[in-house]
Regions:
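Conserved N-terminal catalytic core of the sugar/cofactor nucleotidyltransferase
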Residues: 5, 12-13, 17-96, 105-107
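A phosphate-binding catalytic loop at a beta-strand-loop-alpha-helix junction
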Residues: 1-3
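Conserved core of the sugar-phosphate nucleotidyltransferase
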Residues: 102-179
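Short acidic donor-binding/metal-coordinating loop in glycosyltransferase active sites
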Residues: 96-97, 180
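Short, glycine/serine-rich, charged loops/turns that create anion-binding
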Residues: 43, 99, 126
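Short intrinsically disordered coil segments
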Residues: 76, 179-180
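Residue-level signal for pocket-adjacent positions within structured domains
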Residues: 6-9, 132
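Residue-level detector of flexible, active-site-proximal loop/helix-junction positions
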Residues: 7, 18, 66-68, 126-127, ...
Length: 180
């Protein structure tokens, strides 16, 4: 916690470069990404803006205006805020920028494009303590999500959802519905 009290976790160096650089390099290698949007609270927005200055790819930083845990919007409302503020009307890949991955997101993006549908990544997680710290879904025989729980005390299933989502263009416009 002391490391991230006054500095954003996605910009912490790992192996000589910020976590976000590892993610961006992977995404750049896929050939699918046109630009990046970083959504930040007001406290850390300046750090992200400074980080973007040295980037060869297009990055837009959106300051959501919040400054405390009590006033933060939450992930879905942050996405909605950025979509409205930037008038985004294209496919979106949404990822949490504080994850260091041992795999490429390219396969996930290709899968979503081949299926022609919005997708969430999921994996089996059988440890209850870990299930209680993440999102858990259940799905039907067609892989359609039938329930979604954020950090459940009594999970209905064992499919953990890391923060990696591909949204089709037509589903981006429906983010408002998910909030209501």
């Amino acid at each position: 916690y002391p490391l991230t009290e006054n500095f954003p976790k996605p910009l912490l160096p790992v192996g000589g470069k910020p976590i976000l650089d590892w993610l961006a390099e992977d995404l750049e290698s896929t050939g699918f990404i046109d630009g990046y949007v970083v959504i930040s609270n007001h406290k850390f927005a300046r750090h992200f803006e400074e980080w973007t200055e040295a980037k060869s790819y297009h990055v837009t930083v959106v300051d959501d205006g919040t400054s405390t845990n009590e006033t933060r919007l939450g992930a879905v409302r942050d996405i909605q805020f950025a979509v409205e503020k930037l008038q985004l009307e294209d496919e979106l890949l949404v990822i949490a920028g504080d994850n260091l991955l041992s795999f490429s997101l390219g396969e996930f993006i290709r899968f979503a494009k081949e299926k022609g549908t919005s997708c969430v990544m999921c994996h089996e997680e059988n440890d209850l303590a870990r299930q209680q710290r993440t999102a858990i879904i259940t799905k039907d025989e067609n892989s359609m999500i039938t329930s979604y729980e954020e950090k459940p005390q009594r999970p209905k299933g064992n499919l953990a959802v890391p923060p990696f989502y591909c949204y089709r263009e037509e589903d981006v416009a429906r983010i408002d519905e998910a909030i209501k």
